Amino acid sequence: MAFVHRRAFVTASAAFALPPSFASAQAPVANNRGWGMLTRADRDAAYNNNAVVSDGEQITERWGAASARIRSQRPQHIDLPYGRGDRNKWDLFPGDNPNAPCLVYIHGGYWQARNRELYSCFAEPVLARGWSAALPGYTLAPDATLTQIVQEVRDALDWLAAQGSAHGISGPVILSGWSAGGHLTAMALDHPSVRAGLAISGIYELGPIRDTYLNERLKLTDKEVAALSPLRLPGVGKPLAITYGTAELPALVRNSREYHANRARSHAPGPLIPVPRANHYTIMEELRSPNGILARTVMRLMEDSA
């Protein structure tokens, strides 16, 4: 699948529309009238990726092993603190030129699991081009509220803008993240240092999350649902590619499609990129492979930012 060029960036979503048969087959999810009729078990299932991807943990273990190799090969700028929390740390991988663009990748885990160390392997295509990459950690729920997590990501970007040059990174930032990291990418897109973004399989409407097992740790408030749901906020006028796998849970598919439509209504630029047959985990291979659609998307965004 060819990458959408800059002149076609805003209108590209029409070429990536899901077939009507897929859309009509979706189960009741966020904002559907049927959502309120579901049992708690059905609501939990609507957002439980591990229940439908049987090898999700094995895939994550492979990412971790590959990432450990990269960290061992480039140990000079890892575990750099940007705040007081134990997880408030950066792993920086500077490129050949300090002014090269930098991919900042935010990890997923529904804001309550995983860590930045698992995901260094997704910087490989960028590093192979001589560009920079950086991965921030953040405090997980329930030790932090979602309000605090969103602020920590912004604090991390503040630190990188102020201190990155001391570690060989002073170029423009392209922000990306997967799952919860996709949500955090959307929430930090307006940061002054960010030129553009790639949000992968994100959650952009938090209302239904409050009705699931995920809220046992998040404990979302009415104020947070309103203030931290990207779907409820004005579109940021920076390029944001929004992507999902066509084999993902219908709730996640709907989140991405509705968020893109919401941005398009406000003329915010960026394509919607469905990845055929990809589930919540296998979609990430499109970012790790140099020829993957998501890797090529990131490359184009970085080239355009330089």
Task: Indicate residue ranges for each PLM-predicted region.
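Alpha/beta-hydrolase superfamily serine-hydrolase fold, recognizing
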Residues: F9-V10, Q26-A306
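N-terminal export signals
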Residues: A2-F3, A8-A25
